[in-house]
Amino acid sequence: MSEFKRLMRLKLKMKQKRPEFKRQDWFKCSRIGTSWRRPFGKHSGMRIGLTHRAAVATVGYRGPALVRGLHPSGLQDILVNNVKELVALNPEIQGARIAATVGKRKRIEIVKKANELGIRVFNVSKQKQDEFLSL
């Protein structure tokens, strides 16, 4: 378990040091946007990797393989649409994220059942959970 915690700390440090990968010339034209696109231009300094240009997303920026894709709490992030899917989760290694298409009535049922089973729900605040549990 200590190895897992060490890798989670390493993942956090790597994330803090990782630059924001922005599209080439994103600042020149607002319609382009900042979302990452790999530069392919023949004379592109960014593609070549000149030091005074923005960073290019490469394999070296990836986090540790064992903790890649996990929630910062260390749990797997599982999308849940109903109570049946929630019951199938393992609370020790998995946490729930309620789908955006779920309505309020079913959301309340899911939060109550998750509290009963000891499953963490990532996208419901503590205040909302308390409010749902009191209903």
Curated annotation (Swiss-Prot):
GO terms for biological process: translation. GO terms for molecular function: structural constituent of ribosome. It comes from the Archaea. The keyword Flavoprotein does not apply. PROSITE patterns: RIBOSOMAL_L32E. Pfam families: Ribosomal_L32e (PF01655). CDD domains: Ribosomal_L32_L32e (cd00513). GO terms for cellular component: cytosolic large ribosomal subunit. InterPro entries: Ribosomal_eL32 (IPR001515), Ribosomal_eL32_arc (IPR023654), Ribosomal_eL32_CS (IPR018263), Ribosomal_eL32_sf (IPR036351). Belongs to the eukaryotic ribosomal protein eL32 family. This is Large ribosomal subunit protein eL32. It comes from Methanococcus maripaludis (strain C5 / ATCC BAA-1333). The lineage of its organism: Archaea, Methanobacteriati, Methanobacteriota, Methanomada group, Methanococci. The gene is rpl32e.
